[in-house]
Curated annotation (Swiss-Prot):
Keywords per UniProt: Cytoplasm, Methyltransferase, RNA-binding, rRNA processing, S-adenosyl-L-methionine, Transferase
Transmembrane regions listed in the UniProt entry: none
UniProt source species: Thiobacillus denitrificans (strain ATCC 25259 / T1)
GO molecular function, one term: 16S rRNA (adenine(1518)-N(6)/adenine(1519)-N(6))-dimethyltransferase activity
UniProt name for this protein: Ribosomal RNA small subunit methyltransferase A
Phylogenetic classification of the source organism: Bacteria, Pseudomonadati, Pseudomonadota, Betaproteobacteria, Nitrosomonadales
HAMAP family (alphabetical): 16SrRNA_methyltr_A (MF_00607)
NCBIfam families: ksgA
Amino acid sequence: MHTPRKRFGQNFLIDDGIVHAIVNAIHPQAGETVVEIGPGLGALTRPLLERLPHLHAVELDRDIIARLRRAWPPERLTLHAGDALKFDFGSLGDDLRIVGNLPYNISTPLLFHLLEFAPRIRDMHFMLQKEVVERMVASPATADYGRLSIMLQRRFHMEWLLDVPPTAFDPPPKVESAVVRLIPKSTAEVPSVDEALFARVVAAAFAQRRKTLRNTLSALMRPEDFVALGIDPGLRAEALHVADYEAITAYLATR
């Protein structure tokens, strides 16, 4: 019996009904490149491999890796031993379908890491802490809207698929969970701006949520820049839409 490791944020999915709902939402097909992050004890791995001839999986826990290697031969399950936060998903090709019950202690940095591979991804289906999903899909001028919302909404269409109670896991987490689908936007839907500068602008704007843009963006923007862009410097970061941050980035790049 594998004992869940707190340092890995392990909560294993044990509800078959939830498992099948997730796999049906993914609808995996032979010939697709499907990658599972954190397969754990194989709750998703098993039904995925019932529908697929081959699956990639990224796993850090050596005990789990050994268990999975005993369960499936490498021609069915290719295991990539290591930290998903450092893994080069681009090494697996294009048109990737990425899935997983993500460890809650690394879910936000992992979503930021996956952003850089958006052009190579077809879609992603993740089980996450409900609070994180609320932030991902949040609208401007709400408490949940922030850096994560903007960075993901710029690159992905997102759909909240279902809620998952703590009882679906062993051990039960202290929080509610949810399943979300992310589909990369087409090139035409994503205005071309300097990605590093965009990330810098958004991070600066939200570094101190209670302060106005006049203060948070003072290192990047002058008073006349706000006038030129038609943006009120007395607003807070959460008042601006993704398109506003794209406009700021494009303006700063040409100033």
